[in-house]
From Swiss-Prot:
Main location: membrane
Key words, A-Z: Cell cycle, Cell division, Cell inner membrane, Cell membrane, Cell shape, Cell wall biogenesis/degradation, Magnesium, Membrane, Metal-binding, Peptidoglycan synthesis, Transferase, Transmembrane, Transmembrane helix
Any single Gene Ontology cellular-component annotation: plasma membrane
Cofactor: Mg(2+)
Catalytic activity: UDP-N-acetyl-alpha-D-muramoyl-L-alanyl-gamma-D-glutamyl-meso-2,6-diaminopimeloyl-D-alanyl-D-alanine + di-trans,octa-cis-undecaprenyl phosphate = di-trans,octa-cis-undecaprenyl diphospho-N-acetyl-alpha-D-muramoyl-L-alanyl-D-glutamyl-meso-2,6-diaminopimeloyl-D-alanyl-D-alanine + UMP
UniProt-listed PANTHER family: PHOSPHO-N-ACETYLMURAMOYL-PENTAPEPTIDE-TRANSFERASE, PHOSPHO-N-ACETYLMURAMOYL-PENTAPEPTIDE-TRANSFERASE HOMOLOG
EC nos: 2.7.8.13
Function of the protein: Catalyzes the initial step of the lipid cycle reactions in the biosynthesis of the cell wall peptidoglycan: transfers peptidoglycan precursor phospho-MurNAc-pentapeptide from UDP-MurNAc-pentapeptide onto the lipid carrier undecaprenyl phosphate, yielding undecaprenyl-pyrophosphoryl-MurNAc-pentapeptide, known as lipid I.
UniProt-listed InterPro entries: Glycosyl_transferase_4, PNAcMuramoyl-5peptid_Trfase, PNAcMuramoyl-5peptid_Trfase_CS
Pathway(s) annotated for this protein in UniProt: Cell wall biogenesis; peptidoglycan biosynthesis
EC class: transferase
Protein name: Phospho-N-acetylmuramoyl-pentapeptide-transferase
Length: 361
């Protein structure tokens, strides 16, 4: 809402600062972080009181988890989403369609995750509601979002898929783009969800990816930078940098409480929502394939589960000691902090590689 003050810059010139995306991105980051840090203890206490035993811990998982994680409350995604939304509503341009599309996807996926968490906590079971039904709801939200993105895209840009590195490799997928882009959003949501299995493991790579796509959104939303980098200019997407800034701030605030030993888990409420947000930003900025690079850690995590399940069904043998792959390394003897920090390093390297694709043409 503060963006609207820029329209009064003729009356009070300092208000002109609210026109700048970089300024508002910083403001969103600070606001979201402060909100989560300030209200975090109260939210954690409330969730612990309401949940009692907290998130159920897998009996077949690493035995140390039964001792260190039992009784920890979940649904911490609520504090992330609250901080993110406050910052977005305060600092983003309320007239920007891409912002609203991203917010709707984030809230929709968050609501699905919340209901799943609720069932798990109340039943003290790892099974939420039907996986097929859950995927169906996610797909419905994603398709609606992609149709909206196509509707608000510049003429001739709606259904185009650009390949990184190759500047002339642009394919018009037609209406098939809707299904491809929806797959990206749903896949991103579930990949982050799968990754969220250790203290701090998911939130830091999410922030790294958000920082990367905040930069991408800013560049492709600026006609001068987009022309220089020879990437698709997508008017209006620069505003998504503010959303990414809010996510980083909320993530930093959450990490304060999620650092090992975690006081709270984000749960499906957070992981589905944040993954959906990243997927939507990638779709809106026309960098869907780059998300697979920047979010390569998430791809690795969900791929390990798919490979494990497929291998066991086809051959009766498991490829990994345990899936997702972060548990495989735990079973091999890596300590939890080793797994987490090494995966963070991978996320940083992949983010830099993703950014490099902007210049390598």
């Amino acid at each position: 809402m503060l963006y609207l003050l820029s329209e009064l810059s003729g009356v009070f010139s300092p208000f002109n600062v609210f026109r700048y995306i970089t300024f508002r991105t910083g403001g969103a980051l600070f606001t979201a972080g402060l909100f989560v840090f300030w209200f975090g203890p109260w939210i954690i206490s409330l969730l612990r009181l309401r949940q009692g035993k907290g998130q159920p811990i897998r009996e077949d998982g690493p035995q140390t988890h039964l001792l260190t994680k039992r009784g920890t409350p979940t649904m911490g995604g609520l504090m992330i989403l609250a901080g993110l939304l406050v910052a977005v509503f305060l600092w983003a341009n309320p007239r920007n369609s891409y912002v609203w599309i991203t917010v709707v996807v984030t809230l929709g996926f968050g609501a699905i995750g919340f209901y799943d968490d609720y069932l798990k906590v109340t039943k003290q079971s790892h099974k939420g509601f039907s996986g097929k039904f859950r995927l169906g709801l996610e797909a419905l939200i994603a398709v609606a979002a992609c149709v909206a993105v196509a509707e608000y895209s510049a003429p001739g840009l709606a259904y185009r898929l650009a390949f990184p590195v190759f500047k002339d490799a642009i394919v018009n997928l037609g209406l098939f783009w809707i299904f491809f882009a929806s797959f990206v959003i749903v896949g991103a949501g579930n990949a982050v969800n799968i990754t969220d299995g250790l203290d701090g493991l998911a939130i830091v790579p999410v922030m790294i990816a958000a920082a990367t796509f905040g930069i991408i959104a800013y560049l492709v939303g600026n006609v001068i930078y987009a022309s220089y980098l020879q990437v698709n200019y997508v008017p209006g997407t620069g505003e998504l940098a503010v959303v990414c800034g809010a996510l980083i701030g909320a993530g930093l605030g959450f990490l304060w409480f999620n650092a090992p030993p975690a006081q709270i888990f984000m749960g499906d409420t957070g992981s589905l929502a944040l993954g959906g947000l990243l997927g939507t930003v990638a779709v809106a900025t026309k960098h869907e394939i780059v998300l697979a690079v920047v979010g390569g850690l998430f791809v690795l995590e969900i791929a390990s589960v798919i490979i494990q399940v497929a291998s066991f069904k086809l051959t009766g043998k498991r490829v990994f000691r345990m899936a997702p792959i972060h548990h495989h390394f735990e079973q091999k003897g890596w300590k939890e902090p080793q797994v987490v920090i090494r995966f963070w390093i991978i996320a940083v390297v992949l983010a830099l590689l993703g950014l490099a694709t902007l210049k390598l043409r």
